[in-house]
Amino acid sequence: MTSLNSSASPTSSSSDQSDATTTTSTHLSEEEAPPRNNNTRKRRRDSSSASSSSSMQHPVYRGVRMRSWGKWVSEIRQPRKKTRIWLGTFVTADMAARAHDVAALTIKGSSAVLNFPELASLFPRPASSSPHDIQTAAAEAAAMVVEEKLLEKDEAPEAPPSSESSYVAAESEDEERLEKIVELPNIEEGSYDESVTSRADLAYSEPFDCWVYPPVMDFYEEISEFNFVELWSFNH
């Protein structure tokens, strides 16, 4: 009996030790291992923040995507098909957007939604609606040198003329019209009296001699000039 008890005791002690080691190892493994759910959540948050920051830093254009290495690609879906026309890889987003506008005008016409509608009349037109011709015209549009004034045309419209400027313009027009009218005589102070006196001089301009009486002659001298016939000089 004693031999059996002695042999059983070491086995029980060894089993207890093994149980203790397993429990401690499990506790250590649980403490050392980080939770998986927290890591996945952090990664999702980082990716969402990165995508939001990238969208805020770069402009968003229709039909344009940004590659991970910094280039911009443009493509457009063919009408009534599942395939897309690859327009190319470009350095800037504006170049890719202009390429997309050319393809959209060719495929959809006037109903196309453009990234730069103010440049529609300046874009090159492809020779046909084939994918190759569309790609060629898109590359030409992307290489265009566009002035900033054309892009800011719609953003900053011209200010309407002020009331003061319109009044000055109307006044200048009236002055030009008055210059075309025949110039009237200038009537100043005293000119009316001068005209009256001049008219009086013209109306009553008679020679001065008419107003001078002839010299008084002697009565007898005046009679002697005439030969009087004697009325009672008849001979009987």
From Swiss-Prot:
Q: What does this protein do?
A: Probably acts as a transcriptional activator. Binds to the GCC-box pathogenesis-related promoter element. May be involved in the regulation of gene expression by stress factors and by components of stress signal transduction pathways.
Name under which the protein is recorded: Ethylene-responsive transcription factor ERF036
Give the UniProt subcellular location, in the record's own words.
Nucleus
Q: Which ranges does the entry annotate as DNA-binding region?
A: 60-117
A GO cellular component annotation here is: nucleus
What's the encoding gene here?
Answer: ERF036
- The protein's predominant localisation is nucleus
PROSITE patterns on file: AP2_ERF
Q: Which GO terms describe its molecular function?
A: DNA-binding transcription factor activity; transcription cis-regulatory region binding
